[in-house]
Amino acid sequence: RSSDLWVGTERELRINDIGYEYATSAGEGVTVLSNEFLTGGVTLGARFAFRERIARLPDREVSLGTKWPVLSVNAFRSFTGLWEGELETWRVNASIDKVFHIRLFGDLSLRLMGGVADPNAPYSYLYNLRGTNGGGTKEDPTLLLAADNTFQTMVANEFLADRYAAFHLKHSFGTLLVKGKHFKPRPGVVYNAGIGDLSAPLNHRGYSFTALKDPFLEAGVVVDNILSGVGVGAYYRHGPYAFADTNDNFVFKVTSSFTF
């Protein structure tokens, strides 16, 4: 079996200079707004992969995978006074990954992940659900590169949660459907779902966001490796957070897949 455990400590100053302010009560009728957060904390990480095969090279170790699910856990806890820290907060994340190699049908990759954070923490210590459809609004998407295990049609920072769960699925047919001498595209399908909640939305000022109380759903079709590791993907947003205009629910991206 293969298992890793690491513990660390850190001092970090986070400053938001693009309009966000964190609101705290300083007494009856008095609210204090802040955009600077100094923390001193302890980090803990663990990874467990049962019967993982490892190739040992002269300068590093390379994982050859395992037929069992891989569990990863990360936790953070800050303390007032540690490394002069001024904020006490915490959060815990976990994920389970599994790849099924299905003979004559391709590879099915699954990831189940989730997290819980201090409900009274500032914005940057919570979860934005990893939306990768641009950096601002749906009218002006700026990032058109697909990333696995993220939400392709969700605008960056569109949602905010202090607890969430997400499911990511990708099935790649490999070269089973089309295979030429030089042209070896890899068609596949993608499905992503997520849900969460936000306990104290009024603590966060200056940003426009939605608390993810209903399921966020999207489906996609990809063709990887059309040309030298580069492909294309088309994704469709549906469910409770679908836009009224059907065209706004479609997102097209470039995919990349390189083997080293």
What is the predicted role of each segment?
Residues 1-260:
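Exposed, low-structure sequence patches enriched in small/polar residues
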